[in-house]
């Protein structure tokens, strides 16, 4: 019988073979769709600890969301799928709809500055560009005469 130290040497080989099996066998999408709801259920249970009116404040639940993300990644990798993939993304989008559909982003309404400010901001660079181009042309003509 092998000692624990001898079994420990077999661990990298076992991990290598298991990892290769998932890649060789391909993505088990059915298994992934069966496993991902576990992550969603765990996330829902964690989100119950957060007041509903704080669900739009990422700093209130970022640890739970990280755990959810890690769970979905681990579950997809276990069944031999890459992460992210379209099925996992659609599952995550469903979770977003369930918890964050009422979160809206307040868009800033931009306005142009008053004309007294806008005209100089446009005119000064244009005039400087014309003046510099004129200076270059004048200087190049003057150099041609000296040579």
UniProtKB/Swiss-Prot annotation:
Domain of life: Eukaryota
Pfam families: RAMP
Keywords: Cell membrane, Disulfide bond, Glycoprotein, Membrane, Receptor, Signal, Transmembrane, Transmembrane helix, Transport
Membrane topology term: Single-pass type I membrane protein
One of the protein's GO biological processes: adenylate cyclase-activating G protein-coupled receptor signaling pathway
Membrane-side (Cytoplasmic) residue stretches: 138-147
PANTHER family: RECEPTOR ACTIVITY MODIFYING PROTEIN RAMP (PTHR14076), RECEPTOR ACTIVITY-MODIFYING PROTEIN 3 (PTHR14076:SF2)
Protein's name according to its UniProt entry: Receptor activity-modifying protein 3
Organism of origin: Rattus norvegicus (Rat)
